[in-house]
């Protein structure tokens, strides 16, 4: 972790690193044809630099030419990463305005929100509409540096995130450690029964022992 933080600290001193790692991820997973044809809406938050004015972008605002750029911009954690240029403007991470844009999701029509709170650096705004059901998912383990897009860190974070989500929805048991559903209760009952068995065995043996009465005197 120290090596990664050192790398990004040096990058910050040079004006920020390029988002090449995330750019490659987007190229790999983003199918623009399916994305724009899907009836599922999409929104992101980025921040204009240097004014720090928020820019809330919906799928209808995006084009095939700028979709990737806005996705990169929303994750351009300045000063570790360079701002992303779109047209004549520069944009940085949306966390400078709202790191968990629940209000934006509600404004787009969401009647239930699943919010993943990574506890990363950034602003978190108070939810205005308290009538919407919100389920929070928070990591129970150290995910490593949020600046890292290396495969090993990503795989580890995905695994932890899956486990944390399954625990929230009662599909797995545990807190920091993860167990199959019901295994904790079964193991507890097994150990409890075993403990009681040995206690009863010990007491039954003690009851059969013959003790010699000893009288103590002051002389």
Give short role names for the model-derived ranges.
Residues 1-219:
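Patatin-like phospholipase
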């Amino acid at each position: 972790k120290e090596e990664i933080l050192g790398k990004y600290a040096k990058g910050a001193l040079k004006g920020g690193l390029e988002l090449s790692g995330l750019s490659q991820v987007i190229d790999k997973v983003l199918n623009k044809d399916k994305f724009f044809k899907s009836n599922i809406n999409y929104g992101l938050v980025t921040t204009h630099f240097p004014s720090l004015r928020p820019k809330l972008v919906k799928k209808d605002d995006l084009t095939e030419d700028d979709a990737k750029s806005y996705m990169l911009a929303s994750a351009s954690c300045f000063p570790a990463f360079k701002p992303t240029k779109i047209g004549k403007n520069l944009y940085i991470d949306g966390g400078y305005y709202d790191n968990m844009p629940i209000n934006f999701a509600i404004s787009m029509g969401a009647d239930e929100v699943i919010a993943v709170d990574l506890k990363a650096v950034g602003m978190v705004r108070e939810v205005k509409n308290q009538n919407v059901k919100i389920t929070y998912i928070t990591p129970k383990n150290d995910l490593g540096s949020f600046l890292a897009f290396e495969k090993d860190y990503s795989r580890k974070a995905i695994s932890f995130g899956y486990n944390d989500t399954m625990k929230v929805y009662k599909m797995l048991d545990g807190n920091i450690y993860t167990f199959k559903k019901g295994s904790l209760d079964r193991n507890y009952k097994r150990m409890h029964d075993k403990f009681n068995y040995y206690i009863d065995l010990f007491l039954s043996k003690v009851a059969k022992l013959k003790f010699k009465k000893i009288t103590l005197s002051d002389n």
